[in-house]
Amino acid sequence: MTVRLHPTDAQTYWMSAKIPNDQFLLYCFDTDSPAESVREELLRRAEQISDLGMRIVDFPLSLRYPSLRRAPDTTDLVHIRETGRTWRDCLDTVAEAFTDQLDPHRSVWRLHLVGGVTGAPRCDGPALVAILQISHAFGDGRVASSLARRLFGDDRSAPAPIADRTRIGPREFFRRATRAYDLERQLAADTAAGTVPASAPGRPRIRVNVAPAGRTSVRCLVRDRSDFTAPGISVTVGAATAISLALERYLAHHGDPVPPELGAEATLGKHGERRARNHFGNAGVDLRPDITDLAARAHAISESLQARRRRAAHPAAEAQSLASEAVPAVLLHWGVRQFDATAVPDTVTGNTVLSSVARGAADLEVGGGPVRFTAGFPALSPIMGLTHGVHGIGDAVTVSVTSAASAMPDPDVYCSFLDRAIDEVSTALRRSCAR
């Protein structure tokens, strides 16, 4: 089977040469089953999932977009890491894995197994931790989560439907380009009229907006879903509110001013038909450190997030995506090669990254043990030394923190602020409901 990559996915693939972007999906299972026995179980499951038998093949000189083809062998893609480790050791293993990015020409995935993990949250005894590493070109967080569910025992999880690509001739290219231009003008008019929110402004850089260097640290806070929610407040917004408070206190701890424009670069699912494996965009969301009442802050953050979604839902966005599909592969690849990953902008879309994905019901099982929680770790980038993942399964929500020593030399200090902030936000939301 040969499937040509969508231009969006090809761009993600080519960009990985400049900014590593593999995804790492962690699932913790409450079982003392040996990793060796679980490995065979998972290999059998992987063989039944066609998407896990793929690799990326380049076309000479990028005259066409790369394609997905069958990989010759996947039997050595499940790696057993050292067993009998603590939960902190396991997180260090995750951070170490960031440095060993996939070769997608061989396979688009790899699985790391760590058995006998002691002290894992919500586990009664030793735990088995599985970390699915997957090429971002192969799918966004929702695609990757669907694959993980199938690998870990959910036979009902269906792959995300992706529309077939059609050949685009000169006439169709002209039609799409013209429509994109017309709708871009309409977006400008709608923005001026106030019917569509304006673009989010850039934000001043803070101490974490530096190139990642030194040790990479990973931390996870596993909490109940109810700690983040209230009427009108989603898990994403509740977590963003806690992050805003923790960042505010961390900056003050180091004697830095807290900019009123403090914000997060959030991932938002695109509207319309999924035409690519990566069907999302990024937008800057206000974190509103100027509002001291945490319930009111949460509602203000929710309004900012909804404003970004309303703008992204304008027909101009989808028209632009359709027009970009007609860009020749050689031209898009040339443009990616011109990208300067070392350039430092005056402002940033967000001061940290916030990626939030719901990974379904807690009905997965490996080695006879149920899943207790899941986590994810958005990649660091040249001006982003701190990222946050918010991932839920069942009633458990994990807020993960990935940081570089150059941006945050004291991650445990920050995580203590974040842990307390979640408690305070939860209390504030409950009190607001009782009024």
Describe the role of every protein-language-model region.
Residues 414:
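Acidic-enriched catalytic cores of C-N bond-cleaving enzymes acting on peptides and small amides
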Residues 1-3, 26-47, 54-383, 391, ...:
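Soluble acyl-CoA-dependent acyltransferase catalytic core bearing the H(X)4D motif
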Residues 388:
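Hydrophobic/aromatic beta-strand elements that line small-molecule binding cavities or substrate pockets
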